[in-house]
């Protein structure tokens, strides 16, 4: 009875973000356990270590009476959903600071969100080669004079999706930071057609690749009243961890 009484009076602790919303530890832990199960089936030795990832969360009581997560242990496996989620939070925080500093130095500059794709779908054996070619094409693109003359910096991430037939499709998501002059005059502004032609040239492809480009604007629906806040929201997508 004492055990039942103690359990009934236990306080459930929650780790919340700065907006007061609970962080999805349970969801990520379930994904982690599923990943550990796959490793176990394949007889990987690290399955046990992955299974124990973030099993214990230690909270610290703050002076105001609230509690805050201050310690846990991660398996640090590259494909662990829990570790990737925490890594994405860290990367997002660091990226937000970088964007804020960039905006402070160039207050009139603008952010552009660019998606670059290619038609080819590849198997696992050829994926590494195609990713290398895609990266090479991207650096050719940003060094073209039409792009580089107004480009102040960029953040790039690679997304790989799986097709129904088991092949892979790779594409790039890029957050560009450009001078305000980019939006002034035909000699500076690049339309979607311009970006498509430049990307086709960089890829050395015989087909027109799919390219999407849009200026980052104020997101009033989410209460983002400044251009920088909207860019920060976009940047979070840049470092979003994959689903497993």
Where are these regions (language model features)?
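Residues immediately within or flanking Cys/His clusters that coordinate Zn2+
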Residues: 77
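N-terminal alpha-helical interaction blocks
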Residues: 1-70
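Short, ordered beta-strand-loop transition motifs
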Residues: 62-63, 106, 163-165
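Intrinsic-disorder-associated interaction segments
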Residues: 28, 32, 43-46, 88, ...
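Short, cysteine/histidine-rich loop/knuckle motifs that typically chelate Zn2+
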Residues: 81-85
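Short microdomains enriched in Cys/His and/or Lys/Arg
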Residues: 88-124
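Conserved His + Asp/Glu catalytic blocks
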Residues: 119-140, 145-244
């Amino acid at each position: 009875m004492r055990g039942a009484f103690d359990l009934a009076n236990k306080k459930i602790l929650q780790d919340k973000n700065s907006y007061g919303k609970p962080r999805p530890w349970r969801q990520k832990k379930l994904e982690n356990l599923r990943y550990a199960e796959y490793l176990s089936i394949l007889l990987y030795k690290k399955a046990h270590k992955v299974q124990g990832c973030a099993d214990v969360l230690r909270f610290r009581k703050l002076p105001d009476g609230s509690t805050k997560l201050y310690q846990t242990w991660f398996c640090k496996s590259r494909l662990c959903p829990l570790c990737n989620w925490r890594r994405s939070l860290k990367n997002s925080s660091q990226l937000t600071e970088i964007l804020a500093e960039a905006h402070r130095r160039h207050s009139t500059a603008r952010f552009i969100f660019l998606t670059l794709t290619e038609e080819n779908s590849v198997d696992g054996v050829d994926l590494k080669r195609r990713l290398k070619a895609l990266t090479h094409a991207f650096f050719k693109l940003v060094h073209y004079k039409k792009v580089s003359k107004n480009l102040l910096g960029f953040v790039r991430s690679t997304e790989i999706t799986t097709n129904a037939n088991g092949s892979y499709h790779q594409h790039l998501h890029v957050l560009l930071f450009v001078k305000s002059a980019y939006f002034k005059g035909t000699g500076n502004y690049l339309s979607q057609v311009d970006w498509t032609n430049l990307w086709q040239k960089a890829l050395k492809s015989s087909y027109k690749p799919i390219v999407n480009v849009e200026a980052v604007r104020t997101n009033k629906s989410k209460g983002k009243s400044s251009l920088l806040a909207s860019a920060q929201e976009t940047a979070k997508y840049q470092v979003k961890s994959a689903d497993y």
